[in-house]
Structure formats: C-alpha cells, structure tokens
Amino acid sequence: MTRAGGVLIVLLTDAVPAMGLGRRKGDAMHAQVITFGLNGITEEQFRQASRADTPTFASLPGLLAKIWLRDPETNTYGGLYLWDDQEAYERYIKGEVFNAIKADQNLKNVESRDFGVFEDLSSLTMPKLRAV
C-alpha cells in the first residue's frame, strides 16, 4: 500500500489473469467511474462506513476491481470499477447496491459514467497489481 498526494494507492501483483487480460476476443471488460460529494458526514465517517461495506463490493458478481477515490479539497469521492463485461456492469447499475448508493442521504450529486476498455492496450500498460 502506498500513499501519493493524499491518495491511497493499492498495489496489486499477479492479477493479470484474474483481471481477464489475455481473454478471448469479444469478451470486453467494462469500466465505470462513480463520483459524489459527502453530505453531512466527515471523510473519516465515510471511510468507516465504507470499510464495513467492503465485503459487499468484494462479492459483487463480475467485479474485477474497485479503486476508492477521494479529493477532499473539492469534496469529490467515489470509485473506479473494472467489470468483467458490460453485462456485469449493467446488472450492478440495476441492482440493490448501486440503488442504495444513489439513495444514500449522506452522499450528494451521485454521478456514474461507463466506458469500454481497450483490453489489448491495457494489457501492455497495466502494472502488476495485487490487492492488499
């Protein structure tokens, strides 16, 4: 685990196969960025609540990785999600966990954007990552 500029960076190693790199053509990973502001809670309160939620995220079907994002200066928080495929992403945004995030009164201005992934290029530039 490393901290750079106030951002927690989780280093992963030996995750290339687990992240689906080298998969068959057509099995496209999907990325999602969710951002929001904190509403009436501190960053530490958010961190504690989020820590309690980590088993839920870790068990989401099709979720390859979630990176927790923070920028306290602009009150912007969120997550970068890497999904096994677009179908896994779509199940998530229609499901209970994402709907709970959108309805959470402690979060404001919840926004979500999704992206396709160039798996061939990503496989050439992805550092060896290992969740700790």
For the regions a language model picked out, list residue spans one by one.
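Extreme N-terminal basic, low-complexity initiation segments
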Residues: 2-7
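Short S/T/G/P-rich N-terminal loop/turn motif that feeds into the first structured element of a domain
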Residues: 12-77, 84-95, 105-132
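A common structural junction motif
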Residues: 99-102
